[in-house]
Amino acid sequence: MKLEGRNLTFQYDKGDRRILNHMHITLESGERVGMAAPSGFGKTTCCKILAGYEQPDEGEVLLDGKPLSSYRGYCPVQMIWQHPEQAVNPKKRMKDVLKEGDKVETRIIRELGIEEGWMMRFPGELSGGELQRFCIARALGEDKAAAGG
């Protein structure tokens, strides 16, 4: 998969400074990219635009050359939130949390080092790192690209 942000421009309120100013970014399957900037400089906004949660004021997001906006009801780009405890229902066991997304392949669960015993636990019974693995597995599901937030 190839995810592209072309000429992305975004500002929250007209008259405010632009959070993104004609930004270009290309991500290929398997690539890991980090963004470093002070708070308020658009890292999360960029990820939200790349995942389709926000629309840019200018520019476009393409997945394998096809506009991301053309995916109706199914978006192959998913967010992996920075604070995993806020991304899951605390009253559901982890096996049920994984069912909320698309089917998660057993291979992904193994590759992320998720232990079988963790499946019956509630989110509050897992460490932050263990919980993050579940969020990654759920975001990846089948045939997904992931953006961090």
Task: Report each predicted region and the residues it spans.
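Conserved ABC ATPase signature
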Residues: 122-126, 130
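Conserved ABC ATPase "signature" region
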Residues: 103-117
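Hydrophobic anchor residue at the start of the ABC signature
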Residues: 136
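Q-loop/switch helix immediately C-terminal to the Walker
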Residues: 83, 90-104
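Helix-to-loop junction immediately C-terminal to a conserved catalytic motif
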Residues: 51
